[in-house]
């Protein structure tokens, strides 16, 4: 870990703040949430949505996407310079669903980006409020993480699909800032770096000239983000090697794959935040709740509290199970796609099942789907307990490895043994220990071999009753470690396609 003095809390990253005390952080995060809520209320008014329609998660996603697109400067510039047929670069829109004569109807809306920007700024006291935009990006990213597997993307970059637990935040745009970087998994960073290295191998000019200099700066910055996620000296030294390489190529590619695999046991620090859809914040603001005055945290009890008192609806396709749709959204809300299902089940108070057993597709409805047969139902997003979200991935006991499972990345700071399939993981480490990183590789393998599942990943942390807002009396659950705890285990989830 970097020294405590240099680490900013998520909330500071979230609000681009200087060092702030806890109260100031809670206030600035609250301000951000309040801004999203006010924007959402205004959009619902503009679109003349009923209360029920405004609480429909599909409408929320469209409205969130419109404002993100309105502020996507690079893409807007690109669209203006490369006009494509039938696409107005100055407009943004999407499907809005309305209840008409007892049926759901889809209406495609189109707005001037300028108008959306005006409404957003007005809701945020005239500021661009980038933190609020990033917050919505992270919510979309968490929803993607819970909905799709990235098998194809993993295989394309030469990684093993079983490493999916390292892929948190893989659909986050690069422009998501420090808050976005904090929630990206080790695999996501490795994948971004490998893509750069591959381009460099195929395109002689990639690292050259003025553009190449900028590319190089981006490459080193990504390496530094990755380095900050590792908790052992050997892993970090290896990232330094990758960063310092004059001409990144196959050796760096190999090192990165090795590092990604090592993270299955020597887990990296990846932030988790509960980012909720705008249709949760809007009604709360409308009911008179003042987020800035009351303060808010993305990693404490607040999101759980908010969800206890929220009504959110979703469109349901004919053969989908509403309870399963609820589980998908619950996991997305708490950034729990890669958490051990036993931990999630305990906190939620109902059994959380693996992705392959869910009878539900994603939340978004494609434009060619038949609306005639669409129903809607309430999403059950409440929980039995709450727990603090983690940013650490577990203790590495005195630089000894803490143990992972071939696919979990803890979301909640809850004491548990982490079962992991050492033979499967270690099988990936036979062979290649020569080359300039051989001593680091040897050390990393030694650390992994000495990792024991008994090394609990969070000493003494537990879950809390929803009435216990100060986290005073932890309840340490005991888990049945005999069965499989990963969400994408033996799975057939859909692939994510941009």
Swiss-Prot record:
One of its GO terms (molecular function) is structural molecule activity. InterPro entries: Flu_NP (IPR002141). Transmembrane segments: none annotated. Late in virus-infected cells, may be cleaved from a 56-kDa protein to a 53-kDa protein by a cellular caspase. This cleavage might be a marker for the onset of apoptosis in infected cells or have a specific function in virus host interaction. Residues 1-21 are annotated as: Disordered. One of its GO terms (biological process) is viral penetration into host nucleus. A motif (Bipartite nuclear localization signal) lies at residues 198-216. Coiled coil: none annotated. One of its GO terms (cellular component) is helical viral capsid. Its main location: virion. HAMAP family: INFV_NCAP (MF_04070). Encapsidates the negative strand viral RNA, protecting it from nucleases. The encapsidated genomic RNA is termed the ribonucleoprotein (RNP) and serves as template for transcription and replication. The RNP needs to be localized in the host nucleus to start an infectious cycle, but is too large to diffuse through the nuclear pore complex. NP comprises at least 2 nuclear localization signals that are responsible for the active RNP import into the nucleus through cellular importin alpha/beta pathway. Belongs to the influenza viruses nucleoprotein family. This is Nucleoprotein. It comes from Influenza A virus (strain A/Wilson-Smith/1933 H1N1) (Influenza A virus (strain A/WS/1933 H1N1)). The lineage of its organism: Viruses, Riboviria, Orthornavirae, Negarnaviricota, Polyploviricotina.
């Amino acid at each position: 870990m970097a020294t405590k003095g240099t680490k900013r809390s998520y909330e500071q990253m979230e609000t681009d703040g200087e060092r702030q005390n806890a109260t100031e952080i809670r206030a600035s995060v609250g301000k951000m949430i309040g801004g999203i809520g006010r924007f959402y209320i205004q959009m619902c008014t503009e679109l003349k949505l009923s209360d029920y329609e405004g609480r429909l998660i599909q409408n929320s996603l469209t409205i969130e996407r419109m404002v993100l697109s309105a502020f996507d400067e690079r893409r807007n510039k690109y669209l203006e310079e490369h006009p494509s047929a039938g696409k107005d670069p100055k407009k943004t829109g999407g499907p809005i669903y309305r209840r008409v004569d007892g049926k759901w109807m889809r209406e495609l809306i189109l707005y001037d980006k300028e108008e959306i920007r005006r409404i957003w700024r007005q809701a945020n006291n005239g500021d661009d409020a980038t933190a609020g935009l990033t917050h919505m990006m992270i919510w979309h990213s968490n929803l993607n993480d819970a909905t799709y597997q990235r098998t194809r993307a993993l295989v394309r970059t030469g990684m093993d699909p079983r490493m999916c637990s390292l892929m948190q935040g893989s659909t986050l745009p690069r422009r998501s800032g420090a808050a976005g970087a904090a929630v990206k998994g080790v695999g996501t960073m490795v994948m971004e770096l490998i893509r750069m290295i591959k381009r460099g191998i195929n395109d002689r000019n990639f690292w050259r000239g003025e553009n190449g200099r900028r590319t190089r700066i981006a490459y080193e910055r990504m390496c530094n983000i990755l380095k900050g996620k590792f908790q052992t000296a050997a892993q970090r030294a290896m990232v330094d090697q990758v960063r310092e390489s004059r001409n990144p190529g196959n050796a760096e590619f190999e090192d990165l794959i090795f590092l990604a695999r090592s993270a299955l046991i020597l887990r990296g620090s990846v932030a988790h935040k509960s980012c909720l859809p705008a249709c949760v914040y809007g009604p709360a603001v409308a009911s008179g709740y003042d987020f800035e005055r009351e303060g808010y945290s993305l990693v404490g009890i607040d999101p759980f509290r908010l969800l206890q008192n929220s009504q959110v609806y979703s469109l349901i396709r004919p053969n989908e199970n509403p309870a399963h749709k609820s589980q998908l959204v619950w996991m997305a809300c708490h950034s729990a796609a890669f958490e051990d299902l036993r931990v999630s089940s305990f906190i939620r108070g109902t059994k959380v099942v693996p992705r392959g057993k869910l009878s539900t597709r994603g939340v978004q409805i494609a434009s060619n789907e038949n609306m005639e047969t669409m129903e809607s139902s309430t999403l059950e997003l409440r929980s039995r307990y709450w727990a603090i979200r983690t940013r650490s991935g577990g203790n590495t006991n005195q630089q000894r490895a803490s143990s992972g499972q071939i696919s979990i990345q803890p979301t909640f700071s809850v004491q548990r043994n982490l079962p992991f399939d050492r033979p499967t993981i270690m099988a990936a480490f036979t062979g290649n220990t020569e080359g300039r990183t051989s001593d680091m590789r040897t050390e990393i393998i030694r650390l992994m071999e000495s990792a024991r599942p008994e090394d609990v990943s969070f000493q003494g942390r537990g879950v809390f009753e929803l009435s216990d807002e100060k986290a005073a009396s932890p309840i340490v659950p005991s888990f049945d470690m005999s069965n499989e705890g990963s969400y994408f285990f033996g799975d057939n989830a859909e692939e994510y396609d941009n």
